[in-house]
Amino acid sequence: MVRRLFRRTAVLFTFTMLLSGVSAVQAEQKPAAARPAPPAMSKEDMNAFLARPLIARIATVRANGSPQIVPMWFLYEDGVMYMSTRTYAAKVKHLQKNPRAAVVVDEMVAPTKNKVVTIEGTVEVLTTGVKETTTKIYHKYVGVEGSASPQAQQSINTPRVILKITPKKIETIDTTH
């Protein structure tokens, strides 16, 4: 419980800093020279990590400037992240006003062994190819059979848009070795 609360607080802090233009490194007290850089993933390892059915958290900026963080399913293809969401979701309104977003996908293997991919970028709200992309995302998380279920089909056929996140900056950490 405490670990989960700490993790959520750390994620919220990181997103708040990213969206406000202050990096987590700038927010720390230690000088950069005193901290070794955490080990990064190779591009191949990052692509394999993002191909797994993990949960992403996307942070958008509300009208009042505060962050909204939402867990989402995603698809990462050819260096671009795609998410499917309902047409009238709050995050869509936020992104139409301010297309900047931050996304994190992470996995805690053990208390000191983590894999993290953080993406900062701009988001386009797409209204074409929605059903096809949403179906691909569902295949990733519940398989072809699960995607054909009545519940999945109802969700897939709900009015939706695709969030196309084009990364401006990608950072990775892999402390599992």
Model feature map: region roles:
Residues 2-5, 11, 15, 24-37, ...:
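C-terminal edge-of-domain segments
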Residues 31-60:
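Short, conserved active-site entrance elements at the starts or edges of catalytic domains
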Residues 54-86, 95, 103-105, 118:
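Short beta-strand segments
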Residues 74, 119-123, 165-167:
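A structural signal for short, well-ordered beta-strand segments
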Residues 50-51, 96-97, 156-157:
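Alpha-helix boundary recognition
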Residues 30-37, 88-140, 144:
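Short, structured beta-strand-loop surface elements
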